[in-house]
Regions:
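Active-site/substrate-binding loop(s) of hydrolase catalytic cores
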Residues: 39-40, 54-63, 67-191, 200, ...
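Short beta-strand/turn micro-motifs at beta-sheet edges
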Residues: 42, 46-47, 199-201
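His/Asp/Glu-rich mid-to-C-terminal helical/loop segments that flank catalytic regions of hydrolases
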Residues: 219-243
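Bacterial N-terminal signal peptides that target proteins for export
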Residues: 1-8
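Short glycine- and acidic-rich boundary segments immediately preceding or forming the N-terminal edge
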Residues: 8-45
Length: 243
């Protein structure tokens, strides 16, 4: 091959597009991780951001450490969005894959102070009980999440739990929950607002649509690919939901 032809050929291969495919990753679709706080035992609480659109959506998992299946499901979401960055058009995804890192490490519901983080939010229906914490946001994990909500007010939230096997909601989120239930094996079911829960605080008090996505018992035995096969379409329905 003549030198000029060879040079043009390799310039083509190294160009941003080749055979119709982008060879340069979309920077907005690369997950960026930020420490937003530390747990009682000093473990980092990380938020992952993807996209740079105006609409903010929040995806949470493992606020109860004994309900761990949501974490690999969320990590699989990041992989899917990296491969399909168009799903982030107009949106910013913020996710906390492990809200309760101490509980997650120990596979226990509570944090290391013996507090149920999903009863530690300053909701109007909060109840004073030892396992709910000495006051609303007394725990570093719930404070980190509340501060994240204040810094980046989301258009909607999904919090992934186990093992009730249903799609629940608080606040103006019934239509979102129904769209998610239509896309997965879980039924739509209203469980009611729990005292001091994130659903009560964000959904009822702040008016942010929030879905509690309750996976099945035993789903933690599934790998990320299996979880994504069952629940990925519902997570994508949440992400793409439009009023």
């Amino acid at each position: 091959m003549p030198k000029i032809g060879c040079a043009l050929f390799f310039a083509f291969l190294l160009s941003p597009t080749w055979a119709g495919c982008s060879l340069v990753p979309n920077a907005a679709a690369i997950p960026t991780r930020e420490e937003i706080g530390r747990s009682c035992d000093g473990r980092p609480i990380e938020a992952v951001t993807m996209g740079n659109g105006v609409e903010v959506v929040l995806v949470l998992a493992s606020i109860h450490g004994s309900e761990p299946a949501g974490t690999p499901l969320v990590e699989r979401l990041f992989e899917h969005l990296t491969a399909h960055p168009e799903l982030l058009d107009g949106r910013t995804l913020i996710s906390v894959p492990i809200v309760n890192p101490d509980g997650y490490a120990k596979r226990q519901r509570l944090n290391s102070n013996g507090v149920d983080l999903n009863r530690n939010f300053p909701a109007k229906n909060r109840q004073e009980r030892r396992r709910h914490g000495v006051s609303g946001l007394s725990e570093p994990e719930s404070r980190a999440l509340a501060e994240l909500l204040a810094r980046h007010p989301p258009a909607r939230i999904v919090s992934i739990h186990q093992p009730v096997a249903c799609v629940d909601w608080d606040g103006p989120a019934r239509a979102i929950a129904a769209a998610m239930a239509d896309a997965c094996p879980l039924p739509l079911r209203r469980l009611g607002s729990m005292p001091g829960s994130l659903g009560s605080y964000a959904g009822i008090d702040l008016g942010i649509p929030i879905v509690t996505f309750e996976l099945r018992p035993g789903d933690e035995a599934m790998d990320a690919t299996e979880l994504w096969g069952d629940y990925g379409p519902a997570i994508l329905a949440f992400l793409a939901f439009a009023k």
